[in-house]
Amino acid sequence: MAVKTYNAGVKEYRETYWDPNYTPADTDLLAVFKITPQPGVPREEAAAAVAAESSTGTWTTVWTDLLTDLDYYKGRAYRIEDVPGQDEQFYAFIAYPIDLFEEGSVVNVFTSLVGNVFGFKAVRGLRLEDVRFPLAYVMTCGGPPHGIQVERDIMNKYGRPLLGCTIKPKLGLSAKNYGRAVYECLRGGLDFTKDDENVNSQPFMRWRQRFDFVMEAIEKAEAETGERKGHYLNVTAPTPEEMYKRAEYAKEIGAPIIMHDFITGGFCANTGLANWCRNNGMLLHIHRAMHAVMDRNPNHGIHFRVFTKMLRLSGGDHLHTGTVVGKLEGDRQATLGWIDLLRERSIKEDRSRGIFFDQEWGAMPGVFAVASGGIHVWHMPALLSIFGDDAVFQFGGGTLGHPWGNAAGAAANRVALEACVEARNEGRQLEKEGKEILTEAAKSSPELKAAMETWKEIKFEFDTVDKLDVAHR
């Protein structure tokens, strides 16, 4: 056995953390970063610096390295690839031994991968593009409280996407008027209504009063329609104790689903709430408020596909994913990629959709993809074509903005959805025949006809800021 010796001083990171001959183990956590190095910093040195700072390294040699098996615990930069069309950037692939991370802790994984390293002077820009979680680590995480199939069984809804609506205006309504809007939307044909991300417990509408009026609306709509209904009661709160207090009250009054803002609320709170929901039979809707602060810049931050994986591990039955066709950012191919990462059990590397690694989820349940943001009845054919059945389509303004009121807006969306599902089941091409399908359905639905007339000119044709880098080995 070789004798370890300590030589004080500073040495280049690549001497220890660059290992192009390394073959990743099945149990390694793999990450790919898009790096923009400072001028004059070699690619291998920049990649090794990221591997060091996100694992065992520091800026100088330390004698305590001799007290551990550094060769086992260190992260290894093992491959570098060009970013298509970007001479100053490259992809760095890094392997981390699984023992660097606390079991079942998304918090700990994020603290390592995107902690101090993002302020490193050796790089001008750093973006975490994708992560491969080994199955051995996936199995230590709780994941979604219930998942897609259990939710369908709870809500008794099969063979189609679910329909929702975010109540607007998002702020300022009294609890009673808020409950009235919920009732009208649910009675009109929606499956769910929703608190917006910043509806918590403000002076104009305290949380307990909102919960009570909303539950009254749900029970009334269920009695009149014979369908199971729900409303995402946002339990995000200033403290974990207050969050659980609100969750317990939602359970007490019979609500089927609650909601959490998982980024602003934090992964620690989210994982705890997901565990509580699993133990108490409550569904959990997840909003991604604040995500674009970190994922929209193509040169620095965290890609949203990483957030989808982190959320699936931390726990949630629904996650907002963008719409492709609405008002929010979302490249079509990249969106299709992270939808699969949320819902499927096994996903293969597919650079055309931005997926850098194979990902196995084992028996972990899937998550409903939620399409929300600037959508209306004209988008229904494209939404069904893009998302398929295991999704929630949430029309906020596209319901409440109907010229005849909330119930009519809900009815228009329900008719449009059922017409598109029937057409798809008959083998028709939704995105090519969408106008014809909706026009035919509107002949027997004045609510749909009015909605189509109202929003016939509304489009959101802005170019995507975060374009997909199509890279091949």
From Swiss-Prot:
The lineage of its organism: Bacteria, Pseudomonadati, Pseudomonadota, Gammaproteobacteria, Methylococcales. The modification N6-carboxylysine is found at K194. This is Ribulose bisphosphate carboxylase large chain. The basic functional RuBisCO is composed of a large chain homodimer in a 'head-to-tail' conformation. In form I RuBisCO this homodimer is arranged in a barrel-like tetramer with the small subunits forming a tetrameric 'cap' on each end of the 'barrel'. Heterohexadecamer of 8 large chains and 8 small chains. Its cofactor is Mg(2+). Pfam families: RuBisCO_large (PF00016), RuBisCO_large_N (PF02788). The active site is at K168 (proton acceptor), H287 (proton acceptor). Its EC number is 4.1.1.39. The record marks K327 as: Transition state stabilizer. Substrate binds at N116, T166, K170, R288, H320, S372. It comes from the Bacteria.
